[in-house]
Amino acid sequence: MEFARGQNLRKRTFSDMNISYKNIGIHPNSLPKNNLSRKILFKGKISKNSIPKDSLTNGKSSKNCMSKNDLAKDNSPKKGLIGKKRSAPLDISFQSMNSSMSSSTQKKTRILDEKNKDQSSSNENDRDSPVIVDITLKPSYTSKISRITEIIHKMKELNINRIEDGLSFNKKRNEHDAKNILLHTMEMVEEDCEEEEDVIIENPYLNASLSEDDTDSIVGTDYSEEEKESISETESSSDGECYSLYDSF
């Protein structure tokens, strides 16, 4: 098995990469796309098929070869891309059309075509080219917290609405019950009044204070004076007989 020299590997790894300084370490798509550099950067080893023949020396490869351990040692993160910290994506980042942009990092893109009304002004020259607005989602924990707070607020609103609906319903129900009670009492009073009127009609002299004229009119005073005296004598004699009977006992 033939191995490549470390010098050739470093030359092909870092000189053939066409990557801007801003995109270093942001996403794997921004790394070189040839198999050689990918395997060196991520696995620390290369296979025979992935190395082009031009990079291998003729005749001196066996003397100046590197083992796998030496190759891993040479891939130190001093000068290369390995070991670079990955920058956190911003919530909203503006990039021009010419700059390379990976499709996985951007969630929503929108092209804003802004035309200059006054092309002579230097401040508005940057607006000639369209701009891509990259809106990436926030981390998951923030979205969960915001979602939980939204759910709590919605539940509070629903509970408040239910309480208000219940209060209004209870008010309406109480008013309805009060109206029913008033109607029922009014009906009872009317029935009592009707019964009293019926009793008064049947017995017109039951609760009335009767005078002597009324008694004379009720009994019918067609008697003569002699008859009245005889009636009074009979009443007095009957009273005396009753006393005599009681006294005998």
Curated annotation (Swiss-Prot):
Keywords: Early protein. This is Uncharacterized protein DP238L. Residues 110-129 have a biased composition (Basic and acidic residues). It comes from the Viruses. Induction: Expressed in the early phase of the viral replicative cycle. Residues 51-131, 205-240 are annotated as: Disordered. Belongs to the asfivirus DP238L family. Residues 93-106 have a biased composition (Low complexity). Residues 51-67 have a biased composition (Polar residues). It comes from African swine fever virus (isolate Tick/Malawi/Lil 20-1/1983) (ASFV).
